[in-house]
């Protein structure tokens, strides 16, 4: 198994809509149990898969279903949780009432838009708005790849995709929203046929808030082209 823990920073406003309307906006952001913005792991999976769709290995990595034939995904991706001012993940139920940094996410900016017709003009009654997360907000998530070798280029391809300058998350990407950069990457490989690795793998906490001492840190600048 290969596991990577990745911290992303929004370098432009981020619009990750919940798909539902409320009385404040047409497109509120997704929020977790603490009412803080987060990026669903399913969304990240879809974005990464779409970005890698031209690779011949895409189906074998992310799975496929074609008629009676199919294969499950070899990749598991957690939700990307907000990092607090202490750079710890907001994993699990937290008391955020006294935290000024986290309270700033209670009311988020709203951006106005106009729907454009196929003729390139504004549609009648085409105004809508959406909530966005602040530029500079950081999120952390983990990704696990089921691999037969410790040196799997599929993991490297995924990491290169995430660290690409063209990687975008959420809606409005053509309007400059959703630009992200990797600010931290930790990773480790576990050979589950080896007792020591198996023990370390089983003892690893699933909480993104917990330290991961056996992981190696990789600089973002080392990702592309390695």
What are these regions (language model features)?
Residues 1-226:
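RNA-binding basic/glycine-rich loop and surface signature characteristic of RAMP-family CRISPR effectors
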């Amino acid at each position: 198994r290969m596991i990577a823990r990745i911290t992303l920073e929004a370098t432009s406003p981020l619009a990750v809509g919940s798909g539902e309307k409320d009385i404040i906006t047409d497109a509120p952001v997704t929020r977790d149990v603490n009412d803080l913005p987060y990026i669903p792991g399913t969304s990240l999976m879809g974005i990464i898969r779409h970005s890698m769709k031209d690779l011949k290995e895409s189906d074998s990595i992310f799975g496929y279903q074609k008629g009676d034939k199919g294969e499950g995904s070899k990749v598991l991706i957690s939700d990307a949780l907000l990092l607090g001012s202490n750079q710890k993940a907001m994993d699990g139920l937290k008391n955020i009432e006294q935290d000024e940094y986290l309270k700033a996410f209670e009311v988020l900016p709203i951006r106005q838009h106009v729907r454009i017709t196929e003729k390139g003009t504004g549609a009648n009654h085409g105004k809508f708005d959406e909530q966005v997360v602040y530029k500079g907000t950081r999120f952390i998530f983990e990704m696990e790849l089921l691999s037969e070798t410790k040196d799997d280029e599929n993991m490297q391809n995924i990491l290169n995709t995430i660290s690409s300058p063209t990687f975008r998350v959420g809606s409005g990407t053509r309007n400059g929203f959703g630009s992200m950069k990797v600010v931290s990457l930790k990773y480790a490989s576990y050979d589950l046929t080896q007792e020591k690795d198996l023990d370390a793998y089983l003892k690893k906490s699933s909480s993104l808030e917990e330290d991961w001492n056996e992981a190696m840190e990789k600089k973002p600048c080392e990702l592309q082209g390695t």
